[in-house]
């Protein structure tokens, strides 16, 4: 097979699929599998849409998941109000503010220095596949990197 015919991106997706299966990580397995199907079919025409809106849609779905206990009543209004008087909850609010700030810095860094995106993605996917992490890391990782780089 000629190097010009060799699709490194497909190989990476296949390796990620294998990592997801091996580590029993459904998120990586499903994501890699879906992207392989898109890549090998006419669905590939939707890649620009996924690239432009995928992150926002993912954040919206994640936020819906986080807010569902409030909407369903599983987390009562009384419990929410009491949380403002607990040192653990106040610390959690502070950490949440810090993480949101880091995510904002991460978006700026990834936009201004696209050469680091591949490394951040590889690190995040490896963390998800091998360490059973959750794929919310690239923005936060980029935010932390922006602090390390003094950017």
Curated annotation (Swiss-Prot):
The keyword Translocase does not apply. One of its GO terms (cellular component) is plasma membrane. InterPro entries: UPF0756_TM. Keywords: Cell membrane, Membrane, Transmembrane, Transmembrane helix. It comes from the Bacteria. It is found in: Cell membrane. The keyword Transmembrane helix applies. Pfam families: DUF441. The chain crosses the membrane at residues 10-30, 53-73, 84-104, 116-136. It is a multi-pass membrane protein. Belongs to the UPF0756 family. PANTHER family: UPF0756 MEMBRANE PROTEIN YEAL. This is UPF0756 membrane protein ACIAD2383. It comes from Acinetobacter baylyi (strain ATCC 33305 / BD413 / ADP1). The lineage of its organism: Bacteria, Pseudomonadati, Pseudomonadota, Gammaproteobacteria, Moraxellales.
């Amino acid at each position: 097979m000629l190097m010009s015919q060799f699709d490194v991106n497909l190989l990476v997706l296949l390796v990620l699929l294998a990592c997801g299966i091996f580590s029993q990580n459904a998120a990586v397995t499903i994501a890699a599998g879906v992207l392989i199907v898109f890549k090998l079919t006419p669905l590939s025409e939707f890649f620009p849409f996924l690239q432009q809106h995928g992150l926002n849609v993912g954040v919206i779905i994640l936020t819906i998941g986080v807010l569902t206990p409030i909407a369903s009543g599983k987390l009562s209004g009384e419990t929410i109000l009491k949380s403002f008087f607990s040192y653990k909850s106040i610390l959690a609010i502070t950490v949440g503010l810090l993480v949101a700030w880091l995510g904002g810095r991460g978006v700026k860094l990834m936009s201004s220095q696209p050469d680091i995106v591949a490394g951040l993605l590889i690190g995040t996917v490896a963390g998800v596949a091998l360490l059973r992490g959750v794929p919310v890391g690239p923005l936060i990782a980029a935010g932390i990197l922006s602090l390390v780089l003094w950017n």
